[in-house]
Amino acid sequence: MEYMARPVKPNGAVAERNPERTRERILSAALQEFAANGFAGARVDAIARGAAINKRMLYHYFGNKEHLFREVLRRKITERQASAEGLSGDPAESLPFWFKLSCRDADWVRLLEWEALQEADNPLIDGAGRRALAIRALGRIRQQQALGYLAGEFEPRHLLLAMRSLTMFPMAFPQLARLITGQPVSNPHFQKKYAEFLKKFAAAFQSAGGRRNKTNFEN
């Protein structure tokens, strides 16, 4: 029977043997490290320290850094989808919702920014799975256009891209938002006013009559 050393905490104490709790600690520490430094800059030893385990134990749970990053992405996507359960597809509701979520979930925005900086010319990690989610989102938009809930003259891919941009740009480029508006994006007044703007601006996406239906545009 193979012997596996019990993980050691930074203070020298032996960590408790609780696989699920250990896994959660690893994912939490990995999210912080990937959000701070990106995939290329993240250090496995820093993640292990943050999770209060040794590197051997980390590799036992996730195999390698790429597998760990894939699991962090999968978990964040699942969390975001769960938070939108029951959300109406009416852009007047969904656009403010996704903007507010971006304000609360800065780690997600940072993950995407680091990925754009470091991996733009490389195949995306879990690219096939993420592309499948985007295709599903496009299918829902096309369905809503066919039913008359969204204006049919818009190219669905451009429509989805525009909606994502509107809800994430201020958090992705806070310095530009501050230059334009004179307010930091962390300012509750800015967030309130921009959410109100998105609700009004949403009418531009709707077909005449502005009928509503329940759809989730987030992938």
Predicted regions: what they are:
Residues 1-10, 97-104, 135-147, 165-219:
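C-terminal peripheral helix-coil segments that are non-catalytic and often amphipathic
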Residues 25, 29, 33-67, 71:
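Helix-turn-helix
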Residues 25, 93, 97, 111, ...:
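Amphipathic alpha-helical interaction segments
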Residues 36-40, 105, 147:
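Short coil/turn segments at alpha/beta junctions that flank glycine-rich nucleotide-binding fingerprints
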Residues 70-97, 128, 134:
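Amphipathic alpha-helical linker/stalk segments
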Residues 75, 111-115, 162, 166:
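Short acidic/histidine-centered micro-motifs embedded in hydrophobic/aromatic stretches
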Residues 81-85, 121-149, 157-158, 192-196:
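Amphipathic alpha-helical packing segments from all-alpha helical-bundle domains
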Residues 103-124, 173-181:
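Amphipathic alpha-helical segments used for helix-helix packing
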